[in-house]
Amino acid sequence: MKKLILSSLCMLMGLTSMSAQTALQNEILEVAHRTNNYFMTKYSDPTLDTFVKKVRTSNLWTRAVYYEGLMALYEIDPQQRYLDYTDKWADYHKWTARGSVNDTDADNQCCQQTYMDRYVQTGGKKDLSKVKENLDHQMSTKRVNYWTWIDAIQMAMPAYAKYAKITGERKYLDYAMNSYKWSRDTLANGLFNKKEGLWWRDKDYVPPYKEKDGSNCYWSRGNGWVYAALVRVMETLPKTDKYYQYLKKDFISMSQAILKCQREDGYWNVSLVCPANYGGPEMTGTGLFLYGMAWGVQHGILPRATYQKAMDKAWKA
């Protein structure tokens, strides 16, 4: 899942001393180029369906996450081919959520985050009418209980936040936050363990469910998705916004918990506090945790002295 680290690589660019910065920047860009070139070569036509166990259209969530990374790479390495590749993909899918404009599955809404990135990059020259229709449809149901698994927070929440920033209409952000709070505090008495700073994946993993060693079950990748979502939503908000402050508290709490879970080799376990369950390093969570920590240090939320060693270990991993 190296494509998930593109955003992490971009975040690391500003985290070194001046003496080492150029060398590390070159290394990061080389890895980013190699990773992305592999992907764009292997999937040279971004409109073609994907196949992992079954055929799926190419605007599914796994591809959508790749384009999030590609947009981040473009910010530090503005190559026109990145935009051409993205626009060919978005044009083919008619700048619409996967499935239909009435789809409420967060996985199928994720692609809209990149549609909005391209809208901003082009000064409003891309059509977001289907994005608006999709978000409005879900909001019209008056339900905030769609995000029943924590991955959904990353797949959908930033889309509402981005659209709120583009349009200036607060209702989209309000809806996103109400949905987040439902997953956080209400579903199965809350999927976020405030005492431990980590998330259960869904209602099936909250206590009394336990790992074989008696510990709580916190999946690395799911917590990584939430961690990244907090970053992506906070990026759309001024620091004075009440929602920024709310999410910042969760971000700090998660950061402290994630730091404690890091393995000596720089990775994180599949099950964060139970190394025996699917034992061994887990790449997606590691990449997402590195991304979040790097962002937090860059923005003065996390102390460099506390997190630099962990980031260095994660990068080497």
Regions of interest found by a model, annotated:
Residues M1-A23:
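Bacterial Sec-dependent N-terminal signal peptides
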Residues Q21-K88, Q121-E133, R170-K171, N193-K194:
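Low-complexity, Ser/Thr/Pro/Gly-enriched N-terminal "stalk/linker" regions
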Residues A23, A64-Q79, C110-G124, A156-E169, ...:
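Well-ordered alpha-helical scaffold segments within catalytic/enzyme domains
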Residues T35-S58, Y82-D105, L135-D151, D185-G214, ...:
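Glycine- and aromatic-rich loop/turn segments at beta-sheet edges
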Residues F39, Y43, L70, Y74-D77, ...:
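Sec/Tat-exported extracytoplasmic proteins
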Residues K94-T96, D105-K162:
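Extracytoplasmic mature domains of secreted/periplasmic and thylakoid-lumen proteins
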Residues I150-D151, A161-L272, G279-L290, L302-A317:
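Extended ligand-binding clefts on enzyme/binding-domain cores
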